[in-house]
Amino acid sequence: MSPLTSPLVADDLEIVRRLLAHIDAGTTDDGEARREPVGNYLDPGRFADELRMLRSLPSVFIPSAAIPNPGDHVERVCFGTPLFAVRGSDRRARVFRNACRHRGMALVDGTGCSHALVCRYHGWTYRLDGTLAHVPHADAFPDLNISTRGLVEVTSSEVDGLIVVDALDPDAAQPSLRAFADDAMAALTEGSPWRDKLVPAQRLLLAESAVRNINWKVLIEQFLEGYHIRSTHRETFFPLQYDDLNVVETFGPNSRITFPYRNIERLRHRPESTWTTKQRMTFVYQLFPNAMVATFPDLVIVVVVDPIDIDHSMITTYTVATPEVAEAFLIAAAQQDGASTVPTLLERGVLEDNEMSFGVQRGLRSGANAFVEFGRHESAIGHFHATLDQRLALLTATHST
C-alpha cells in the first residue's frame, strides 16, 4: 500500500489566512476549467462501466456513529449489493453481505440492536461476529457444516469515524487490480484530514435514505462549489456565507472545499493564537468515489450516493454530533413534540440543492448541450471527473490485458 504524505490539507490557521486574503482581493481559488460530455451522464454503456469501476474500489459505507454499541446494526445497498454493518461484543465493526445462508433472506432491515442476528424466515441464528450459532431442526440438513456456514464477511476498515468497505467485485482480488484497490483504500484510511472534525461526533441524530431521479454524478457535483450560493441559497446560506469564495484542496482522488461564513472577518484583529474555524466555516470533504463529509457549526453530515441507473440514485444522509450537542438537540426535539433534530435552515438548503440538481437532470435530456461547462471556480468538480476518467481508463486497460 502506498503511504500518503501528511499533512494532506492546510491547517486551520492557513485556511483562515487564505480566506481573509480572498475577501480582501475579491478572489477565490482558481483551477482548471472542464467540459464534461453530456453523453457521459446519459449513456447506459458508460454507466455500466462506472458501476463496474465503483465495485472495484473501496468506499465509505457508514459513519462509526451509526453503530456505536455492541449489537447495533444497519443495512445499506452499496453499488447494488445489499450489505449490513454490525458492532460485535468485542466492539469491532464488521460488514457482511445481507443474506441468510439458508434461503438467502435479507437478515437485517433498516437499523436495530440485538444480542444475535436471527433470520425472521426460519430462525437461523448468527452471533454478532457472523458465525452460525443455531439452526432449528438441524437434523433436517445432513450435509450442513455449521462451522463453515457463517455470514459472508466483506473486508472493511474502521478509521477516523468512518467504516470503509473493500472492493465488492470478486475480480478486484486479481493481482492486477489489487494494487488499484489498495491505493484507493489508502486514500480513505491513511492520514485522514477529516479526523479532528468527525471523530468527536459520536452520536447519530438522524439517518435518512431517499431515491432521487438524478444521476449520481450530478448529486455529487452539487456539494463541490460555492459559485451557486447567491443564486440558489439567497434566503438560506447566502446571508451567512460568501458567494463564489472557496478554498479548494485535493489529496489523492479526494478533495476538500472550504465555505467561509461572513463572521470570519471578526478574526481580523484578533491574535492568530486565538483563531478557530469553529462557527466560521463549513468544510466539505469529497471522498472518492461517492461520499461527502460536511461540517457545520454543531453537526457533521455524512452523505453517500449510490447509483441505481443513469437517471436514479439512492442518497443516504447520516447526521452526527458530539454527545453534548446531540443531547441538546434531542431535548429540544422532545419539547417540540418530536420535531426534526436537524436545523430547518440546513434542511431548506439541502432541498434547494436537490431542486437544482433535478433541474440539471431534466436539462441533460433537452439536446441543447453537447457538454456541461465547469468554470475555473468549479475545479473540485473537474478533479472529481478527471479522477473518475482516470480510474475508468485504468480499469479498462487492466481488463483488456
Predicted feature residues:
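C-terminal catalytic domain of Rieske-type non-heme iron oxygenases
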Residues: 3-5, 86-87, 92, 98, ...
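Short Pro/Gly-enriched beta-strand edge/turn motifs at strand-loop
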Residues: 56-66, 135-140, 284-289
